[in-house]
């Protein structure tokens, strides 16, 4: 059980930069995965003989799951601590990458992308929380800048790196490309990430609210991704949009009465 203070004494002034390198390595892996798949859509549709509407779920499933998993990140950090959460999400991310790379069909590939998205959604708040916890107050602006740089540059280079991989080898290897950053991040995380004693009792969490958000987000993302192809007046698109709107109203009503709301609307 070593928190940031104990680890800082152990590793000295370099500790904040060791933590920065750790979370940046994980951030680069996840940032690349968030955008590089866009250039693989034509290859995937040809490989599996599916339409664009199915292939788009590689991106839609990733983004939707990432959006929802962000909401559970603070609870996970509180329960597991930074180190275990970091190792867990990188493991999930690695499993998702491997599933996508060796997928025998589009469904397994999308499932792998959903795992990647879930890990990414927790990873972004975790990285910022960790850097804030180890940087002194007067240097937290620098921490924000470093994190912002990774958040912008990694997704920017994703399509470039992905395109080179597809042209040179195969679209399947595209999903292995983040792993050279992921594996060192896990190894460094085992040493440098702060840890804590596991809570004996789980803190309360609004799981019903989270399930509602999951349904709302997937319905909305599905409608938005299919609208340009099928037409915004298509029944499937209209039903999903109305469903997500109705779900949003129900979610707001629930949050106003929930004992431990996911979003405190009274603020």
Predicted regions and their residues:
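Cytosolic juxtamembrane N-terminal segment immediately preceding the first transmembrane helix
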Residues: 1-31, 46
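The feature captures the transmembrane alpha-helix scaffold of multi-pass secondary transporters
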Residues: 17-24, 36, 40, 94, ...
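Helix-loop-helix hairpins in multi-pass membrane proteins, especially solute transporters
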Residues: 70-208, 235
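Extracellular/periplasmic helix-loop-helix junction of adjacent transmembrane segments
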Residues: 40-70, 106-110
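Hydrophobic transmembrane-helix bundles of small-molecule transporters
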Residues: 167-267
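Conserved kink/hinge residues within transmembrane alpha-helices of Major Facilitator Superfamily
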Residues: 31, 38, 63, 67-74, ...
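Membrane-interface helix caps of multi-pass secondary transporters
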Residues: 33-51, 76, 131
């Amino acid at each position: 059980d070593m928190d940031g203070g104990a680890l800082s004494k152990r590793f000295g002034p370099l500790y904040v930069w060791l933590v920065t390198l750790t979370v940046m390595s994980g951030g680069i892996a996840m940032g690349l995965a968030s955008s590089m798949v866009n250039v693989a859509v034509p290859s995937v549709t040809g490989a599996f003989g599916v339409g664009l509407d199915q292939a788009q779920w590689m991106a839609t499933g990733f983004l939707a799951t990432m959006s929802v998993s962000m909401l559970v990140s603070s609870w996970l950090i509180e329960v597991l601590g930074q180190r275990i959460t970091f190792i867990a999400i990188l493991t999930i991310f690695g499993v998702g990458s491997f599933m996508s790379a060796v997928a025998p069909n589009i469904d397994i590939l999308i499932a792998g992308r959903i795992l990647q998205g879930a890990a990414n959604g927790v990873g972004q708040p975790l990285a910022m929380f960790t850097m804030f916890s180890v940087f002194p107050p007067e240097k937290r602006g620098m921490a924000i800048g470093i994190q912002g740089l990774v958040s912008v540059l990694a997704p920017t280079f994703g399509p470039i790196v992905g395109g080179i991989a597809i042209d040179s080898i195969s679209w399947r290897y595209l999903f292995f490309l983040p792993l050279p950053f992921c594996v060192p991040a896990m190894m460094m995380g085992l040493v440098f990430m702060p840890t804590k004693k596991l809570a004996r009792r789980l803190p309360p969490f609004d799981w019903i609210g989270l399930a509602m958000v999951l349904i709302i987000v997937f319905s909305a993302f599905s409608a938005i991704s299919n609208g340009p192809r099928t037409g915004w007046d298509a029944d499937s698109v209209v039903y999903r949009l109305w469903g997500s709107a109705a779900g949003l109203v129900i979610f707001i009503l629930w949050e106003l009465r929930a004992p431990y709301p996911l979003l405190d609307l009274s603020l």
